[in-house]
């Protein structure tokens, strides 16, 4: 299956209006007069960051790319949810995460 075939298969599953045909990586959910925008980007070692990179920088980039998606939609962040798989190298990641969250005044929600 090619990447385009894979995306087409996902689009067939994403029938909820908030998915907007998977036009981008943000979902837009309407609650009466309020709008909630959700986004989630994943980063893969060797693709989005190199093994020798500082994990503090990796954490920074992970949050920043998601905050950028929200900004592109004109949304202000309520907070971020983070997941990662880094083995035993958590300290640097936590330091970078703390820094980027403080810089953008965005709370960690989970």
Protein language model annotation of sequence segments:
Residues 56-79, 95-103:
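Small-aliphatic-rich amphipathic alpha-helix that forms the alpha element of a beta-alpha
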Residues 87-95:
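Short glycine/threonine-rich loop-to-helix capping motif typified by GTGT followed
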Residues 1-54, 73, 82, 88, ...:
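Extreme N-terminal cap/leader segments of soluble proteins
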């Amino acid at each position: 299956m090619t990447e385009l075939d894979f995306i087409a298969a996902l689009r067939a599953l994403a029938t909820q209006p908030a998915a907007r045909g998977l036009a981008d990586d943000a979902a837009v959910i309407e609650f009466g007069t309020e709008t909630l925008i959700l986004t989630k980007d994943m980063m893969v070692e060797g693709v989005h960051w190199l093994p020798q990179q500082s994990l503090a920088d990796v954490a920074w980039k992970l949050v920043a790319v998601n905050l950028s998606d929200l900004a592109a939609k004109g949304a202000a962040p309520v907070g971020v949810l983070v997941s990662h798989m880094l083995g035993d190298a958590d300290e640097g990641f936590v330091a970078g995460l703390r820094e980027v969250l403080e810089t953008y005044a965005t709370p960690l929600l989970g």
